[in-house]
């Protein structure tokens, strides 16, 4: 079974997924890392944050290649983004050709208070993120819900929204494990 677990940057997805992987024994595959590896091999980017600034066509090509690799895996938690906010608008993180390749059983969206997400982003020196306000983060979380609903209609997978309350990643992880096991 393949599960797709998503959330906006700074929601605490990596922390929660580390716990989920440990508790479930299911490997986590980072979709963005696969895309980055392909883009870097092609000389298109030097760091992962540059991917979202590539042309739409290039991003689509990278999505296809990463989706095909994941589709070959028997059991995995796919760590990705439901939608990608670009200078041109929101790009589906899982367009039709990727949905077919991945064939997920469930989409889980991890959410948190937008003000907390902003604070986490502001305090993370390891990433070169665009400066977004609380309203923009809220909008992105809402867009993720819309994309998840559309993906579910197409794929038949269920959608689960999990709150990652401040200081309680274990609680969010436990809820996710119950859904994906």
From Swiss-Prot:
InterPro entries: Adenylate_kinase_AdkA, P-loop_NTPase. NCBIfam families: PRK04040.1. Its main location: cytoplasm. Belongs to the archaeal adenylate kinase family. Coiled coil: none annotated. It is found in: Cytoplasm. ATP binds at residues 7-15. This is Adenylate kinase. Pfam families: AAA_17 (PF13207). GO terms for cellular component: cytoplasm. It catalyses: AMP + ATP = 2 ADP. Its EC number is 2.7.4.3. Keywords: ATP-binding, Cytoplasm, Kinase, Nucleotide-binding, Transferase. One of its GO terms (molecular function) is adenylate kinase activity.
